[in-house]
């Protein structure tokens, strides 16, 4: 029987397919996460062992808000770099499609950290538009209405505009 290697773990977990620079395999063959800018590695096996000691059993959802923050910063800096390189004068807005992840803690983190980066939200359905209006606190942040628009969807978008929201209806 062949001895298990770190490369075997990388292949098994397909780290190169999804891990970017945030996830990897450590010398023990365990998956680790590097959620913070200081490059601290957190061994996920250690996290699960600690949770087991506290009588928390899988499945467990782990969130890494620092990764969300870093992705917003990287996206903004890439667009800003291109804007300067090509002498593009218009302002850049990052738009997060709410359908990607509607979990309240995720959306709140994205909105909170995204404020300084002109981050707006995109809603492709009436339920998504309700959610976006409810969480979008800054009135100057963009709300992009994209998707099927029946009369009630358009009325809701116009009502949000009357409430001071910056609404753009894509036709």
Set out the residue ranges of the language-model regions.
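N-terminal basic/disordered segments at the start of proteins
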Residues: 1-40
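A short linear-motif detector with a strong N-terminal bias
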Residues: 1-4, 10-12, 39-41, 73-75, ...
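Residue-level signal for well-ordered alpha-helical segments
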Residues: 2, 8-10, 44-45, 49-52, ...
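Residue-level detector of functional hotspots within protein domains
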Residues: 8-11, 17, 80, 84-86, ...
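Generic serine detector
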Residues: 9, 16, 21, 28, ...
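A general structural signal for short secondary-structure junctions and capping/turn motifs
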Residues: 12-15, 21-24, 50-52, 86, ...
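Low-complexity, highly charged intrinsically disordered N-terminal segments
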Residues: 25-39, 45-102
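Active-site-proximal beta-alpha core segment in soluble small-molecule metabolic enzymes
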Residues: 87-171
């Amino acid at each position: 029987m062949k001895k298990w290697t770190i490369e075997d773990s990388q292949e098994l977990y397909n780290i190169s397919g999804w891990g970017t620079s945030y996830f990897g395999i450590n010398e023990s063959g365990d998956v680790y996460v590097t959620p913070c800018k200081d490059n601290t590695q957190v061994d996920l096996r250690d996290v699960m062992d600690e949770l087991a000691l506290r009588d928390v059993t899988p499945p467990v959802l782990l969130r890494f808000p620092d990764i969300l923050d870093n992705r917003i910063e990287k996206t903004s800096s890439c667009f800003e770099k291109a804007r300067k390189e090509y002498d593009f004068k218009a302002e850049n807005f990052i738009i997060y499609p709410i359908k990607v992840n509607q979990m309240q803690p995720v959306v709140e983190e994205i909105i909170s950290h995204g404020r300084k980066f002109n981050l707006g939200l995109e809603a492709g359905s009436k339920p998504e538009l309700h959610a976006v209006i409810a969480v979008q606190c800054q009135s100057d942040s963009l709300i992009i209405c994209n998707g099927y628009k029946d009369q009630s969807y358009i009325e809701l978008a116009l009502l949000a505009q009357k409430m001071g929201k910056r609404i753009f209806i894509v036709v």
